[in-house]
Amino acid sequence: MSKGFNRFILVCLGLVLAFMYVPILAIIGMSFNGTPYGMFPYVFTTRWYETLFTTSNLPAAAWLSLKFSLAVAAAALVVGTLTAFGLQYWSPRWARRFNALMQLPIIIPWLVTSISILLLATFVGAGRSYLTMFLGNLIVVLPYVVLLVNARFAEMDHAPEAAARLLGASPARVFWDVTLPAVLPGVMAGGIMALIVCFNNFVLQYYLSPVEVNTLPVTVFTRIKSGYQADLNALSAIIVLAAVLLVVLLSRLGYSAGDLFGGSTGGKERKGE
């Protein structure tokens, strides 16, 4: 390829990266700006972080969202992993049909899903409740776990499982000592996706949560309607930092994005090559 074409590709790559990360960096910078409404001149301050942890209602909402998302992700991990494991004993024809069915909650707009679940919950007498919100979010995040873990099952070598059975290991021992470690990257990826999707899912939480319950997405939506909120920038910066720390932690453990969301070998195996 010519040098001009290479430069064009690099420029396009730079524009894409700028489009992705400049807004995030801008929010972090604005979280330290003491000028009203985040305008110029830029005056460095940490008072928005002080406001966040003293008088703001955002930390309580964030903590509620985190606890709720962890509970939903944990349930999705257990149900999704066992479902993907059970699919290995289905015929390929029915397994493909089930996988196609599991994609529907991802494809169908969350607004439609929320209204449908709310109508059903109202019909059975549950209404807007923690249980309704929990089941609604579980329905949406469960396909991510099933599909990611099932993809890892499809790529794994089943010879160690057969060898363990020949040596007299029980089915439970084979699953815990052989199967689960082999699909662990897929399980981790499914858990991360379930946590992120549930934590950010404003639509489901807005329509299904009890009236007095305000998760972080609902709280942010309510407050942003009244105008610029500087402590929102501070909370956003902390969430970005937490995401970066998670990526660094996974990298230190030997897992990359390719290991978790694709590829035929896990990070631990790559490090030993």
Task: Please state what every model-predicted region is.
Residues 1-56, 60-63, 67, 254-273:
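N-terminal, non-cleaved signal-anchor transmembrane helix
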Residues 37, 46, 94, 111-140, ...:
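Membrane-interfacial helix termini and adjacent extracytoplasmic/periplasmic loops
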Residues 22-24, 69-85, 111, 115, ...:
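Hydrophobic positions within alpha-helical transmembrane segments of bacterial inner-membrane proteins
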Residues 2-3, 35, 49-58, 199-249, ...:
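Interhelical loop and adjacent transmembrane-helix boundary motif
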Residues 12, 17-24, 104, 114, ...:
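Transmembrane alpha-helices
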Residues 1-6, 70-102, 119, 175, ...:
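Transmembrane-helix boundary motif in ABC transporter permease subunits
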Residues 2-11, 94, 150-161, 165, ...:
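C-terminal transmembrane helix and the adjacent membrane-cytosol boundary/short C-terminal tail
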Residues 62, 87, 104, 159-167, ...:
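Short hydrophobic faces within alpha-helices
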